[in-house]
A protein has these predicted regions:
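Helix-turn-helix
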Residues: 2-37, 41
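Short alpha-helical functional segments enriched in proximate histidine and acidic residues
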Residues: 3, 49, 78, 115, ...
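Short coil/turn segments at alpha/beta junctions that flank glycine-rich nucleotide-binding fingerprints
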Residues: 6-10, 61, 126
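Residues in soluble alpha-helical coiled-coils and helical-bundle/repeat scaffolds
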Residues: 33-37, 41, 59-63, 79-80, ...
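Hydrophobic alpha-helical connector segments
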Residues: 41, 52-85, 135-142, 166
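Short, basic, alpha-helical segments at the C-terminal edge of helix-turn-helix-like DNA-binding modules
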Residues: 44-50
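Amphipathic alpha-helical segments used for helix-helix packing
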Residues: 67, 80-103
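Hydrophobic/aromatic-rich alpha-helical bundle segments in the mid-to-C-terminal region
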Residues: 102-106, 110, 124-173, 180-186
Length: 186
């Protein structure tokens, strides 16, 4: 992962990957068909690790607003050089050119939307959230908002701190989910 996040997958040589993995280039090519394959499998491995950690953390938090805040904190980049987000950016750049990459990425994003949907459903059930018209639409829209905030952060605009992007995301969530935040006539 370090090589990819340091220079980008297009700048990394297979020999460099093999050297870091203590393998030959032939061995790397035996397991991976291309550098893109290495990128996607690295991202999938990291997302699997992060999903387990996120779900364990969220399970320990009481209160749906606190869970949502923590979810947002897990989603957004820690810094403008967040290695996982760099992997996502590398993969996103390939998605418009490959339906296979797009489907692969959709499968990686699904657990995020599922976790968000579970928080929203729990919040509605507890009366802490106003029910959105459709939870799936809300999760798609909210994850898109988080992606946009993440991109702003990754552009290395230092005036846009992590605390500020989390605050902006929570404000958007409150605007849609907080009781009294919406008209009663839909």
């Amino acid at each position: 992962m370090d090589l990819i996040t340091e220079a980008g997958i297009d700048q990394v040589r297979l020999a460099g990957i093999a050297q870091r993995a203590h393998m030959s280039t032939g061995q790397v090519m035996y397991y991976f068909t291309s550098k893109e394959h290495i990128l996607l499998e690295t991202l999938a491995w990291q997302e699997h690790q992060d999903t387990e950690a996120r779900r364990a953390t969220l399970a320990k938090i009481t209160g749906v607003w606190r869970q949502l805040d923590r979810f947002i904190g897990h989603y957004l980049p820690v810094s403008p050089t967040d290695p996982v987000w760099i992997l996502w950016m590398e993969a996103w750049a390939r998605a418009p050119h490959s339906a296979e990459v797009s489907q692969f990425m959709e499968a990686l994003l699904r657990p995020w939307r599922d976790d968000l949907a579970a928080i929203v459903a729990r919040g509605v059930e507890e009366g802490a959230f106003v029910p959105p018209d459709a939870i799936d639409d809300f999760t798609l829209r909210f994850v898109a908002l988080l992606d946009g905030l993440a991109l702003q952060r990754l552009r290395q605009l230092h005036q846009l701190s992590r605390k500020r992007v989390i605050e902006l995301a929570m404000n958007a969530a409150r605007a849609e989910l907080a009781p009294g935040s919406q008209d009663t006539e839909r």
